[in-house]
Amino acid sequence: MRGEFYQQLTNDLETARAEGLFKEERIITSAQQADITVADGSHVINFCANNYLGLANHPDLIAAAKAGMDSHGFGMASVRFICGTQDSHKELEQKLAAFLGMEDAILYSSCFDANGGLFETLLGAEDAIISDALNHASIIDGVRLCKAKRYRYANNDMQELEARLKEAREAGARHVLIATDGVFSMDGVIANLKGVCDLADKYDALVMVDDSHAVGFVGENGRGSHEYCDVMGRVDIITGTLGKALGGASGGYTAARKEVVEWLRQRSRPYLFSNSLAPAIVAASIKVLEMVEAGSELRDRLWANARQFREQMSAAGFTLAGADHAIIPVMLGDAVVAQKFARELQKEGIYVTGFFYPVVPKGQARIRTQMSAAHTPEQITRAVEAFTRIGKQLGVIA
């Protein structure tokens, strides 16, 4: 029986390789930055990191992390409620809450844990969750853990969302919660939070937003999609990560009203049974928030880079998805073309990843590019030139 188990895994791995679905982990030997070094020693320009503000290797963050270790140690060796809460943890939670315009915040090991520990803690069998069809896997998995009745609506479709809200209310749901990404990361599309909040008001529902791909750089002050959509104060729960724009290390959080956060501290299993966030990450994250609030220079640079790439790629004849975001998917359609395109780009010194089914729908394969404030205009032009050469070779553009 044990032999059959391992043989089944071997067969499944071989099938994944044969179907071109096996995920290879390419090795980077440098720090995460715009210009990275890969295993063969070559230098490539990275266009597939979540390093939106270019802070992953920023000297001020490295200095803050070192200072955090000097003053607070390397690790906590405990969960928060036993002996794993330092003054810096509380400071970061307060700063996150204030930055997001929420009453309180709670730290997790990751946003995946924040979402995984949210729904089952707050909702029960008498309740309903209405989730966008393109929500992140962490929301999907978190909802699965909850006993609430589950509904799904087509991506960003307010008419269908209203239909699901009516269904939930007609079924007698006690509490109804709408769950959505703030930015749909495969498409670079910002959620229609104005429409979501309007419907939530109409049907007396709660709104939860995972804003991992927005906090730090979306909105006038970088507060996220709720600022961009002018619905600050109307979103009940915001989850997010410290592993993207806010330094790129690890850690997640949930921000909400005080009673929500206090209940999560009492009952949220990923919070109760996971080690506290490391002091170095906490210290660096506090520094990130100070930098983001100090001025718009990094955000301005990021958006200038995104505009340049989108304009030059459109002029070259490429079909691009999304709008108003640093995620700019280059649509290719065919999975084989997407994989070959990505391989050829790396030979040209441009580091990207092709996405295809089952990550995206069949026939919608793409290369998801992500701009960073760390990119220079010259690097972006070089990337567009490489895309154009290979696009012509593969018949993607004329």
From Swiss-Prot:
Record: residues binding pyridoxal 5'-phosphate: C111, F112, S185, D210, D211, S212, H213, T241, L242, G243, K244, S274, N275
Q: How is the cofactor bound?
A: Binds 1 pyridoxal phosphate per subunit.
Query: Which coenzymes or cofactors are required?
Result: pyridoxal 5'-phosphate
Q: GO biological process annotations for this chain's record? A: biosynthetic process; L-threonine catabolic process to glycine
InterPro entries to which the protein is assigned, alphabetical = 2am3keto_CoA_ligase, Aminotrans_II_pyridoxalP_BS, Aminotransferase_I/II_large, AON_synthase_class-II, PyrdxlP-dep_Trfase, PyrdxlP-dep_Trfase_major, PyrdxlP-dep_Trfase_small
Catalyses:
glycine + acetyl-CoA = (2S)-2-amino-3-oxobutanoate + CoA
The entry's keywords: Acyltransferase, Pyridoxal phosphate, Transferase
UniProt KW Acyltransferase keyword: yes
Q: Where is substrate bound in this sequence?
A: H136, R368
* Pathway membership: Amino-acid degradation; L-threonine degradation via oxydo-reductase pathway; glycine from L-threonine: step 2/2
User: What Pfam families has UniProt attached to this entry?
Assistant: Aminotran_1_2
Bilayer-spanning residue ranges: none
The terms under GO molecular function for this entry are: glycine C-acetyltransferase activity; ligase activity; metal ion binding; pyridoxal phosphate binding
Q: What is the documented function of this protein? A: Catalyzes the cleavage of 2-amino-3-ketobutyrate to glycine and acetyl-CoA.
Similarity section: Belongs to the class-II pyridoxal-phosphate-dependent aminotransferase family.
Q: State the name under which the record lists this protein.
A: 2-amino-3-ketobutyrate coenzyme A ligase
- What is the species listed in this Swiss-Prot or TrEMBL entry? Escherichia coli (strain K12)
